[in-house]
Amino acid sequence: MLTADSLNLILAISEGELVEEIVIALLASPQLAVFFEKFPRLKHALTQDIPRWREQLKTRLKEAHVPPELEEEVIGYQKSQLLSTSQFIVQLPQISALLRRVGSPFADQAQRLIADNPHFTPALHTLFLQRWRLSLVVQATSFNQQLLEEEREQLLSEVQERMTLSGQLEQVLVENEDSAGRLWDMSDGKLRRGDYQLIVKYGDFLADQPELMQLAEQLGRSREAKSVPKKEAPLETFRTLVREPASVPEQVDGLQRSDDILRLLPPELATLGITELEYEFYRRLVEKQLLTYRLQGDAWREKVMQRPVTRQDYDEQPRGPFIVCVDTSGSMGGFNEQCAKAFCLALMRIALADNRRCFIMLFSSEVVRYELCGRDGIEQAIRFLSQRFRGGTDLASCFRAIAEKLQGGEWFDADAVVVSDFIAQRLPDEVVNKVKELQRVHQHRFHAVAMSAHGKPGIMRIFDHIWRFDTGMRSRLVRRLRR
């Protein structure tokens, strides 16, 4: 079968000009003009696709097959070029029959040339072939234009779908030119309108929670930096966690003398039932001399202190990817679930703007993984946002999955973020030791985003930084009143 590309070579037709005309017509379409005006940051991203459009149009010409009638006529023309004038005169009846059989536009003109010139000279032979070629060029050009026009319509339809998707998500995910380009690349997928509306929904929720967006900005843009010492150092405020033992009972740690009725030893409680010892019991109660269980725990609170500023002139280090672990237990349902998903969406926005990767892991009874900044990032984000938080809490599996991920070479400078209410069991010692090794040896940073004020201090103290976003009703009302 003869392809359109081969036909153009035979007839010496330049396909480059045809392709360029189609590209210009595509860029001049009213739909794109309106889109560029409404979303200027996406204009540059879209124009980066122009080389791909050219290649797609050229590929269409290379792969398309010409109609059988046109192919037969071209083959007849090629054979006629090889004939001498005397041979050509002998073949004229067959050539005329061929032109009529394939329905060539040149058939009538050829018949007139034959009828008007009973004696064919070499000049008429050349004229006949020139006009035949001209007719073939017109047919080939028309066929090329038809093919390219169909491809233009298909391209325009594809671009319109991507424009609709990118336009809807621009406000949610685009922060600068880089993120606009990455969003445009990710829009090259098969998504329906109802799918990406879920991202718009959580984007609207995030807009209603500016404190959550601010928290994501602080976490996402925080990074240790090299600095230069300065002699005259002013004081600066810094926050640190201080330990307050015995304020949060977690485990039995011996005996003590006190007046705590709820933690009395059974022998002490027995004296209360003996008449002769009842007054002795009350005396020891007043003097806080009753034997009781001592329950010891590790409570930590944030303390604000002053220290001299010893470093200035920061040289910020490059930021690495995010590995975000999200608790999907039942206690994280409802408003907590909305906040956790919106927070991850905010981190995705930051990752797109800073050309970073954002890897999400959901942990409950099993670990589910999503990468939000790959080529199929939008589809992955939709799947993540569609999840329901109804599982259990297995924080240890979460840390094991993070540690395994950080072993990969491409994640050597990643930041780990755990989003949870941290109402869970104690972490095994081997998990705690592994996290400390990653922090000490490999300089990985672990962030906690605490969605509750009741998280276990024993779990949270392994993190480098704790970002608090209390989702309790009181905190929600306070934030609303502050706006």
UniProtKB/Swiss-Prot annotation:
Organism: Cronobacter sakazakii (strain ATCC BAA-894)
Oligomer and partners: Homodimer. Interacts with RavA.
Cytoplasm among keywords: yes
CDD domains in UniProt: VWA_YIEM_type
PANTHER family named in the record: PROTEIN VIAA (PTHR36846:SF1)
Record's subcellular location: Cytoplasm
Lineage per the UniProt record: Bacteria, Pseudomonadati, Pseudomonadota, Gammaproteobacteria, Enterobacterales
Main location group: cytoplasm
SMART domains found in the cross-reference section: VWA
Domain of life: Bacteria
Recorded family membership: Belongs to the ViaA family.
GO CC, alphabetical: cytosol
Record key words, sorted: Chaperone, Cytoplasm
Protein name (record): Regulatory protein ViaA
Reported function: Component of the RavA-ViaA chaperone complex, which may act on the membrane to optimize the function of some of the respiratory chains. ViaA stimulates the ATPase activity of RavA.
